[in-house]
């Protein structure tokens, strides 16, 4: 492979626009105007954050005025800030959102103004701290499949973000126990209907061990986790996180590259002894696109392409959007679809026809097809595998600007003049009699993993993407819908949008 020729794929950073030069950058979010408080932040850091925000399409004022909607401060006492605001003679201070720097950080990471949560707001007067449990302890199950978690009730993001970073670090260190513990803790905290203000509020809640509680106590006391800040500065963690952001690169490959002394994507591309596989080459080739989040509008546009293609081949075909978008998420890393035919056997070779049609349309940038190895005679499987045996393909498609509805259109970098972007798409085609199990599994999140654990430990059943096997009756249970599976397990049905565990 000609690595040198791929260097052009890794773009050089553009020189940032100086503070005070908002006119040089397009303002994407006209409903939001920021003011960064220099006190405690310092002028150099304020200038840097101003340039960063403007580069992402935010309007930032240099002087506080009535045009400002969001005031962002760092390490300031609430009463001092509010006194400072009152002294500026603004028409209506009550309409301002006075926010901690964490809101700004979250917004920069997402590339858009995130929803203001309680943890972001700097309140004028303390309202008192509620240390009662956020919900009856008896109602919080140890199993995510018995909890309802939407995208709206994540009131403890200050904790769950830290837990997920600690879990990721543990995964890089191949520490399976701590990794699982932190992810279970994050899942429980996500399900709570209100914010946790003290440790007394979580007494009796499941999956919150002493290590987790110690981390939460540190956050409650200092507003941050020093362990996570240490991890973020760790060279190995930074390298592995960067390398695994490339499509086709897992933790083991990332670790191997790190041990060879590589620290950047450029170094990987210029290292003559590294042989990238086909998926990894595509990952580098389209890195600037597929490392960005996919919006719901983009997922909908991809859905129209897949639906039109699929129904052109088979008008009676069955198609479902799965993954995070089925759970109601606004953004995701890729777009997943389940495809099948109403008659058993008609699904054979289905994806190959879809792939050929996408090629004919000139929008197929990459394809990795895997044929079916599903064998009903080998059911049940006593060990769950992360990847099922159905035919599937991992694609990268070209999505045009005109195909995406809404004002924002495609997710692109400022200055990107292309009228298209690359999007990752996964297609899975199970037989119709396995469709319900595959749909449940591919909807994803910890909910599905805990559902399998619940089935085995509480019901003596084996559940995976292929079947539900009753070990007592020694037979596979039939299901044509997800509701059927919940009924077999003796569980209340949980809607997809309530499965964001």
UniProtKB/Swiss-Prot annotation:
Spell out the molecular function terms from Gene Ontology: DNA binding; DNA nucleotidylexotransferase activity; DNA-directed DNA polymerase activity; metal ion binding
InterPro entries, A to Z: BRCT_dom (IPR001357), BRCT_dom_sf (IPR036420), DNA-dir_DNA_pol_X (IPR002054), DNA_pol-X_BS (IPR019843), DNA_pol_b-like_N (IPR010996), DNA_pol_B_palm_palm (IPR028207), DNA_pol_lambd_fingers_domain (IPR018944), DNA_pol_lamdba_lyase_dom_sf (IPR027421)
EC number annotated for this UniProt entry? 2.7.7.31
Q: Spell out the residue ranges making up region: Involved in DNA binding.
A: 249-253
Catalytic activity field: DNA(n) + a 2'-deoxyribonucleoside 5'-triphosphate = DNA(n+1) + diphosphate
> Where along the sequence does the record place the motif called Nuclear localization signal?
11-17
Cofactor binding: number and manner: Can also utilize other divalent cations, such as Mn(2+) and Co(2+) (in vitro).
- Stretches assigned to the BRCT domain: 24-121
Q: Which domain of life is it from?
A: Eukaryota
PROSITE patterns given for it? Answer: BRCT, DNA_POLYMERASE_X
**Nucleotidyltransferase: is it a keyword of this entry?**
yes
Keywords, ordered alphabetically: Magnesium, Metal-binding, Nucleotidyltransferase, Nucleus, Terminal addition, Transferase
Which residues are involved in binding Mg(2+)? 334, 336, 426
Of the GO CC terms on this record, one is: nucleus
Family affiliation: Belongs to the DNA polymerase type-X family.
Q: What is this protein called?
A: DNA nucleotidylexotransferase
């Amino acid at each position: 492979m000609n690595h040198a020729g791929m260097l052009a794929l890794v773009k050089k950073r553009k020189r940032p626009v100086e503070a005070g030069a908002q006119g040089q950058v397009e303002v994407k979010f006209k409903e939001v105007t920021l003011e960064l408080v220099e006190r405690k932040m310092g002028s150099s850091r304020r200038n840097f954050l101003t340039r960063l925000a403007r580069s992402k399409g935010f309007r930032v004022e240099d002087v506080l005025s009535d045009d400002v909607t969001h005031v962002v401060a760092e390490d300031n006492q609430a009463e001092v800030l509010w006194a400072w605001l009152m002294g500026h003679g603004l028409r209506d201070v009550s309409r301002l959102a006075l926010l901690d720097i964490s809101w700004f950080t979250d917004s920069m990471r997402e590339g858009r103004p995130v929803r203001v949560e309680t943890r972001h707001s700097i309140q004028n007067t303390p309202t008192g701290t509620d240390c009662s449990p956020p919900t009856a302890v008896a109602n919080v199950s140890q199993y995510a499949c018995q909890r309802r978690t939407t995208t709206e009730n994540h009131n403890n993001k200050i904790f769950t973000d830290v837990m997920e970073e600690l879990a990721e670090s543990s995964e890089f260190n191949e520490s399976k126990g701590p990794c699982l513990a932190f992810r279970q803790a994050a899942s429980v905290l996500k399900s709570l209907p209100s914010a946790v203000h003290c440790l007394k509020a979580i007494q009796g809640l499941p999956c919150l061990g002493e290590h987790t509680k110690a981390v939460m106590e540190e956050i409650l006391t200092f507003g941050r986790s020093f362990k996570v800040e240490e991890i973020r500065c760790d060279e190995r963690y930074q390298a592995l996180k960067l390398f695994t952001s490339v499509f086709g690169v897992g933790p083991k490959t990332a670790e191997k590259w790190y041990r060879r002394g590589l620290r950047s994507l450029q170094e990987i591309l210029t290292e003559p002894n590294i042989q990238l596989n086909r998926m990894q080459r595509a990952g580098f080739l389209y890195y600037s696109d597929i490392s960005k989040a996919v919006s719901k509008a983009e997922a909908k546009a991809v859905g129209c392409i897949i639906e039109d293609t699929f129904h052109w081949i088979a008008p009676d075909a069955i198609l479902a959007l799965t993954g995070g978008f089925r759970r109601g998420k606004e953004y995701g890393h890729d777009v997943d679809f389940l495809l099948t035919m109403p008659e058993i056997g008609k699904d054979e070779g289905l994806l190959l026809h879809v792939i050929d049609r996408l090629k004919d349309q000139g929008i197929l940038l990459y394809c990795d097809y895997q044929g079916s190895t599903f064998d009903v005679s080998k059911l049940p499987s006593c060990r769950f595998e992360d990847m099922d045996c159905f035919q599937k393909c991992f694609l990268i498609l070209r999505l045009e600007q005109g195909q995406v509805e809404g004002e924002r259109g495609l997710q692109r970098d400022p200055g990107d003049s292309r009228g298209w972007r690359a999007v990752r798409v996964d297609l899975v085609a199970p037989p119709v009699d396995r469709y319900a199990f595959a749909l449940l599994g591919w909807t994803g999140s910890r909910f599905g993993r805990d559902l399998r654990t619940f089935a085995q430990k509480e019901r003596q059943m084996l559940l995976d993407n292929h079947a539900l096997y009753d070990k007592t009756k020694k037979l596979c249970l039939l299901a044509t819908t997800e509701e059927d599976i919940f009924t077999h397990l003796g569980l209340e049905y949980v809607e997809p949008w309530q499965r964001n565990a």
